[in-house]
């Protein structure tokens, strides 16, 4: 039996039995819930599987695009995606590793997030580190 309980952040639910890499699975009902979860946990966790509803299902969920933007604001990046069932997929999110490359797509997204005033101190710190060591000026092309 899978036990799910409300996490410390409103709108996010944490699955207590973790996938094999021992990261929790959380479900956030919207972008605000994902942002609240990261605000509370970005320094405490080494990663998480975010359960995202597939578009055709119309289930209340943070969207993939929203999740990427919010993750970047907090210095986290998306990684591997796994199919889960007919309704959801799992997207792995982790804090950006030191010296990890920035994609041209994420550089452009972050510039928009800065202009919109959405970036948070942890995300800005990742940008500063990338600018300091040259990764910002030579983003990877995907």
Question: What do these predicted ranges mean?
Answer:
Residues 3-4, 8-142:
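Charge-dense, helix-prone N-terminal extensions
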